[in-house]
């Protein structure tokens, strides 16, 4: 007979109706589906982990444990976890607004939006670190947005408990997000997550078309040498101070990298953005930047193709008119693409 108050094991029955697969390009050992949970009567996201790919049964619920331990408003929560004979199922809220990867597939975030996303992500990462964990898979597809446009860190499939001396070994990381120390030493530290946040910010301010155009023939060597990603290649409207902070987070030497999430947060909060330029693709080869200086008419900067060459023009924009901005030194035509971007760097320095 069980004595009163003694623990009692309960085996409950849970079910979910699996719907369409989402994030099909993400994760080699799992599938994520939009699903319906009849117990709570709503839409959820279910991540199914193949038990056959988890050789140690004691690790079946390791990802669920990490998500629960790192509970924070800037971390995607876990509702519950369960299992079938073949899979471990992690049940999470559905965020219909989508991920950072969705937002930057074509064009980048504005500087202010990128800074807000970075701050939210770092607050979540700080909570993860304070619970003795490394995330090890911070990238645009793992940054989701809630209905308040707050960024949350998702997917703890690669996370690990910090070992003795604050080091994690036995890594299973996404190759284009692997920091130099992981290639060199096969080990990760707190600075590893901060590098990945820096890389995520780099992608956010430049857009993934820009990032994905960088294809080094030897990724390992390019990462170790600091040539990938190209720290000098930024979209021309990105403020110089934001570029500096991102470079500090991407320092190839982890001992001189931004040391903590708190220090990274402090660096981002000190950045002043005078004009929050928004970049958009107007047509093939035609890019437009739109910004509104405080108390003044809006500005539009255009990079437009002219045959095989490029022109840069600047206009002021009001609710009723679009007029050429008369700064002859800033208008320029008949340039190569490279020369046009060099000129755009000058344009944004002058206008901002």
Residue ranges and their predicted role:
Residues 85-99, 103:
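Conserved short submotifs of the Hanks-type protein kinase catalytic core
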Residues 53-69:
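AlphaC helix of the eukaryotic protein kinase fold
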Residues 80-82:
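A short, aromatic-enriched beta-strand patch in the conserved N-lobe beta-sheet
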Residues 117-118:
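Activation segment signature within eukaryotic-like protein kinase domains
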Residues 129-145:
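Catalytic-loop of the protein kinase fold
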Residues 252-275:
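Terminal C-lobe "cap" of eukaryotic-type protein kinase domains
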Residues 167-182:
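Conserved activation segment of eukaryotic-like protein kinases, specifically the C-terminal portion
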């Amino acid at each position: 007979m069980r004595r009163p108050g003694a623990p009692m094991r309960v085996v409950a029955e849970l079910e979910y109706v699996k719907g369409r697969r989402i994030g099909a390009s993400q994760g080699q050992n799992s599938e994520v589906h939009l699903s319906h949970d009849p117990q709570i009567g709503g839409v959820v996201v279910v991540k199914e982990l193949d038990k056959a790919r988890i050789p140690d049964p004691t690790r079946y619920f390791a990802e669920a444990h990490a998500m629960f331990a790192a509970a924070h408003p800037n971390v995607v929560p876990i509702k519950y976890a369960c299992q079938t004979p073949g899979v471990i199922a992690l049940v999470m809220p559905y965020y219909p607004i989508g991920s950072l990867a969705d937002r930057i597939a074509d064009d980048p975030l504005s500087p202010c939006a990128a800074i807000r996303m970075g701050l939210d992500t770092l607050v979540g990462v700080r909570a993860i670190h304070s619970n003795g964990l490394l995330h090890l898979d911070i990238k645009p597809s793992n940054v989701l947005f809630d209905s308040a446009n707050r960024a949350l860190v998702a997917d703890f499939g690669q996370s690990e408990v910090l070992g003795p001396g604050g080091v994690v070994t036995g890594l299973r990381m996404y190759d284009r997000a692997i920091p130099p120390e992981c290639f060199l030493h096969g080990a990760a530290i707190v600075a590893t997550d901060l590098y990945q946040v820096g890389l995520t910010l780099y992608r956010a301010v430049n857009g993934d078309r820009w990032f994905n155009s960088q294809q080094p023939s030897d990724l390992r060597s390019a990462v170790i040498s600091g040539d990938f990603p190209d720290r000098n290649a930024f979209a021309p409207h990105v403020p110089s101070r934001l570029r500096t902070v991102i470079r500090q987070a991407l320092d190839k030497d982890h001992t001189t990298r931004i040391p903590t999430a708190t220090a990274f947060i402090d660096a981002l909060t000190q950045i002043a953005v005078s004009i929050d330029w928004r970049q958009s693709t107007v047509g093939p080869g035609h890019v437009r930047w739109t910004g509104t200086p405080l108390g003044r008419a809006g500005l539009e900067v255009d990079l437009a193709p002219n045959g095989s060459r490029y022109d840069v023009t600047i206009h002021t924009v009001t609710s009723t008119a679009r007029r050429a901005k008369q700064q002859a030194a800033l208008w320029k035509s008949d340039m190569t693409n490279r020369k046009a971007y060099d000129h755009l760097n000058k344009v944004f320095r002058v206008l901002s």
